[in-house]
Amino acid sequence: VKLDEKFTETDRFSSFVRPKFTNKLNKYVKNLTHINEEDLKKASDFVTVLSEFEKFSSGDDTVFLSWSDTDMHVLSENCRQFLSADSADFICKYADLQRYAMKFLKTETKNQVSLSNAAEQFGISNEGLSLHRACDDSRLCAEILQKTYDKRQFAGYIRVLDRKYYRRLMFKPYYVTSQDDPDFDISDFSQNCPHCKKPLSATGKIKHFKNVFTQKYLCKHCNKRYKIHLKIKKTYDGAVKNIRLNELK
């Protein structure tokens, strides 16, 4: 859906995309979206639909929104596949509405909130809408934006879609599995006994299992045994280390 500066809906765009590499939808997708194979057979290919969407949506000050950046990730993957480009070049500004709206939701968890649950918390009815279909999901997003819009706060969530944005978007985090990795540091295992505060002594070799490095230790002062667990996750911004010390009984 397209909104003007007063958040009034001015136009809608809706189109299926005909898949190139498969002719069948799995049962889960059918049940979730209520889309069937016949809908897709009549559709145009990705490049054609993207061109039509560009004509519908382009503008110098257009800000594109979606509920989480998953749609941007999928769009970028398809642009790489069919256009040999990281992105659709007419999409220059983008905001993740889910991240923005979470500021206004009363929730005790940091987990992502679904669009339908967010709409319910904002008192927005989804009656008569077909959820998980792009056009109706966009209508819910528009209503959530209307309910929460604050010019200053929202501006902080608008991203310019440059190369750095797409490098971050497409980066796949992974766990370090080798001691030869530059982010593996043996000194991370240097811990003190929680009871007497004396340095622990290693009693075995470092082992690795299911993305976790472990090593057993002994406190020679109070004769307590421990195991240290180290997990290293590589993210776009660098390595994140999680170190846990367990006392062995």
Which sequence ranges carry the predicted segments?
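Active-site-proximal helix-loop-helix substrate-binding element of RNase H-like nuclease domains
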Residues: K24-N26, K30-T33, E37-L40, Y100-S138
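Conserved non-catalytic scaffold segment of RNase H-like nuclease domains
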Residues: V1-S76, R80, P173, I228-K249
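Conserved beta-strand -> loop -> alpha-helix junction used to position metal-binding or nucleic-acid-contacting
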Residues: A88-M102
